[in-house]
A protein has these predicted regions:
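C-terminal transmembrane helical hairpin of 12-TM major facilitator-type secondary transporters
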Residues: 307-355
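Cytoplasmic helix-loop-helix junction between adjacent transmembrane helices
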Residues: 127-169
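Helix-to-loop junctions at the C-terminal end of transmembrane segments
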Residues: 84-96, 182, 290-308, 394-395
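Symmetry-related core transmembrane helices of the 12-TM Major Facilitator Superfamily/SLC fold
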Residues: 195-214, 401-418
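Structural signature of the two symmetry-related core transmembrane helices
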Residues: 100-114, 310-327, 407
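Central cavity-lining transmembrane alpha-helices of secondary-active solute carriers
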Residues: 72-90, 281-294
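Helix-loop boundary and gating motifs at the non-cytosolic
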Residues: 23-78, 243-269, 276-279
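Juxtamembrane intracellular "pre-TM" segments in multi-pass secondary transporters
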Residues: 6-32, 216-247
Length: 425
């Protein structure tokens, strides 16, 4: 009788214990939850950042700032925003601690609404630079964490695609905060701008809450293991990563900056000012949709080919689509310009999804923070060099000069893509 009871108790115990399949499903659900939390963080964060970005120039101008001062401030901010990413990536790899940098970086967004509480230009400049430094601190470790979460049966492409889509929703909604304030108050003076900044306080609170929740779930259930294995040795940084960085430089250098497109459409009278901003918003929507589609395609290619680096095949979309942007967006036709900006949105979505996903498939996790830091610096340098060159060429030779420049740069990117694809197989 005792033996029979023991067998029954053991059977009940085994039934009560969750199966390995159930545990795996539970882990995947937690990962999806964290990925969605990070998506909300990106969305809310961009509401704060892009909202302020749409108003900073006008607000500083009302307080007496010069164009030279704004140019130097923005240039310095972008320099810190990209250069320090290499430092933060290196720190998180050396220490194995990603979350302090992520939380501190997003926490720095609190300085943005505080910009509405002062009219001192020196203080405002300091707050602006703190926000840029905060973004540099958080981006490499955040991307590193997301890249490993994506390996939990979700897919790197779709994870970064979802992040970009929600990011663009925030980028679209952010400026609407100030637009709503202006429409409601019927004013565009200093007080109106300060009210707009004040409305960003609760959004910052949502950012912090979402980040802390993500941190709690990841650390409690150990969803990210420091020093976990990543790509295989034959697909590591020493073999392919430098070649990928060369591709990144030329691909980003060949992307026409929207500032040049907007300048052309305005100076040539192709479309009205309101239509320019509307088309830019449409391009951001296209960006969000393209990010999801190309991200999913990236994962599908990897699964079908059965090789970790197979997703790199989708990189061909970047040089192919980038070449068409100047010939459409810098034309004299409103319809062609609209098509060009839609193509511009596709390129941006691919940049933010596939190019970031590829880092995860080319590097081991313990070096991924540094890899993302290097990627961001190279990307920023390429975009800066390309935009500067295209601006000079447009002033001297107009749209044809920019088109020729893009052709050369993206042709180089395509040749590097071919070599990269061969090395990755």
């Amino acid at each position: 009788m005792t033996n029979r009871q023991s067998v029954v108790d053991q059977a009940r115990s085994e039934q009560a214990r969750p199966s390995s399949a159930q545990c795996a499903q539970s882990a995947v659900r937690r990962v999806v939850f964290v990925v969605l939390l990070f998506g909300l963080v990106s969305c809310f964060g961009d509401i704060v950042y892009e909202g302020a970005r749409s108003a900073n120039g006008q607000y500083f101008s009302l307080l007496g700032a010069s164009a030279t001062m704004m140019g130097i401030l923005y240039g310095t901010g972008e320099f810190f925003g990209y250069a320090l990413r290499l430092v933060s990536g290196r720190i998180c790899d050396e220490t194995g601690r990603h979350w302090p940098l992520i939380i501190a970086g997003y926490g720095s967004l609190i300085v943005v609404p505080f910009m509405g509480l002062t009219t001192n230009l020196g203080v405002l400049c300091a707050l602006f630079l703190i926000e840029r430094i905060g973004k540099a601190l958080r981006n490499p470790p955040k991307d590193a964490v997301l890249s490993q979460l994506s390996e939990k049966k979700i897919g790197t492409g779709i994870v970064f695609g979802l992040q970009e889509a929600l990011d663009q929703i925030g980028a679209f909604a952010g400026p609407m905060v100030f637009t709503a304030v202006f429409l409601e108050s019927g004013r565009t003076d200093v007080a109106a701008y300060q009210l707009g900044y004040a409305w960003l306080f609760p959004v910052v609170a949502l950012v912090v809450i979402a980040v802390v929740c993500a941190w709690r779930v990841v650390t409690r259930f150990k969803l990210v293991e420091e020093g976990a294995a990543g790509a295989s040795k034959d697909a590591g940084p020493a073999a392919i990563f430098p070649l990928y960085m060369a591709f990144t430089f030329f691909a980003s250098a060949g992307l026409v900056a929207f500032s040049i497109i907007g300048f052309h459409l305005k100076s040539r009278g192709v479309i009205a000012d309101g239509a320019i901003t509307t088309l830019y918003s449409v391009a951001m929507i296209v960006d969000a949709i393209a990010a999801l589609v190309i991200g999913r395609l990236y994962d599908v290619v990897k699964v079908r080919v059965g090789k970790r680096t197979a997703g790199l095949k989708t990189l061909f979309v970047i040089p192919l689509c980038s070449i068409g942007v100047p010939f459409l967006a810098l034309s004299e036709s409103a319809w062609l310009a609209a098509a060009g900006l839609a193509l511009y949105g596709i390129v941006l979505g691919t940049h933010e999804t596939v190019m970031r996903s590829a880092i995860a498939d080319l590097t081991v996790f313990r070096k991924r923070g540094t890899a993302y830091g290097i990627f961001n610096v190279v990307y920023g340098l390429g975009f800066f060099a390309g935009s500067s060159l295209m601006g000079i060429l447009y002033d001297h030779w107009g749209s044809p000069g920019v088109g020729a420049c893009v052709l050369v740069l993206e042709a180089a990117a395509f040749l590097l893509f071919i070599r990269l694809n061969r090395r990755a197989q």
